[in-house]
């Protein structure tokens, strides 16, 4: 979505001028209306923490469901997976401090120095590791990174089997993509960066299905015969 102050974005949400964009994530008009309070609360939280006169963008990354092929991704097999309309959302704005601050609903604020991309053993298993890992992944692939402030909220519940960590990784990756790379990084690369963050920084071995489904969205088949270059096809 376009960049604007939190107050401007709130007015656009309440006036229904963003409904067509929101339908791409939430499908029906009824579902879209249910999201209004969610996004308004997210922007209110951003204003309270980071100020009212910031240029802010809104972001979303879905959870995923596996239709077929559980664990076949890391066995070089095929999977059928889908993004769902339970998602993680964020309001984010660049800063010039090279510091990333992320306040997620229900959690304390994560603060990560974007100039220190080394693996921190004390962060393993915790969300700052995912933020640092995503930043490191973008750097590894030759893309720009920098500081930003963000508030997030998620309906992809941890432990629900809908890939809450992958949704969060992809959400952070999407923020870095649009805040610092003009949206030029493709969904497959964001998924690979998210997997890198989870494997190397969070300390959890995983295949690529979760991140790929969250990043690409929709219903997709993914052939992992060559795990570094999976073949993705949309299913109508």
Segments from the language model and where they lie:
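Conserved hydrophobic/aromatic beta-strand scaffold that supports enzyme active sites
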Residues: 81, 89-91, 219-221
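Anion-binding (especially nucleotide phosphate/pyrophosphate-binding) glycine-rich loop
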Residues: 2-58, 86-193
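Short Gly/Ser/Thr- and Asp/Glu-enriched loop/turn motifs at secondary-structure junctions
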Residues: 60-62
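ATP-dependent small-molecule kinase catalytic core of the GHMP/sugar-kinase superfamily
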Residues: 2, 75, 178-236
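Short Gly/aromatic-enriched secondary-structure transition segments
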Residues: 76-83
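Redox-cofactor-proximal catalytic regions of oxidoreductases
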Residues: 70
């Amino acid at each position: 979505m376009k960049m604007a102050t939190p107050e401007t974005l709130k007015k656009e949400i309440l006036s229904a001028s963003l409904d067509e964009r929101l339908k791409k994530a939430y499908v029906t008009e009824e579902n879209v209306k249910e999201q209004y309070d969610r996004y308004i609360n997210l922007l209110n939280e951003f204003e309270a923490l980071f100020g009212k006169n910031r240029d802010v963008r809104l972001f979303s990354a879905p959870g995923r469901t596996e239709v077929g092929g559980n664990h076949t991704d890391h066995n070089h097999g095929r999977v059928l997976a889908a993004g769902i309309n339970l998602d993680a959302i964020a309001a984010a704005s660049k800063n010039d401090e090279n510091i990333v601050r992320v306040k997620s609903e229900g959690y304390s604020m994560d603060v990560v120095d974007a100039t220190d991309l080394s693996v921190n053993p004390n962060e393993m298993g915790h969300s700052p590791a995912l933020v640092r890992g995503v930043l490191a992944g973008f750097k590894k692939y030759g893309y720009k990174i920098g500081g930003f402030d963000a508030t997030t909220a998620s309906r992809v519940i941890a432990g629900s089997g809908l890939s809450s960590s992958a949704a969060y990784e992809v959400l952070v990756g999407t923020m870095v993509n649009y805040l610092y790379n003009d949206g030029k990084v493709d969904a497959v690369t964001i998924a690979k960066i998210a997997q890198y963050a989870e494997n190397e920084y969070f300390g959890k071995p995983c295949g690529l299905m979760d991140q790929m489904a969250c990043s690409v969205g929709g219903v997709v088949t993914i052939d992992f015969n060559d795990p570094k270059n999976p073949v993705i096809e949309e299913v109508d």
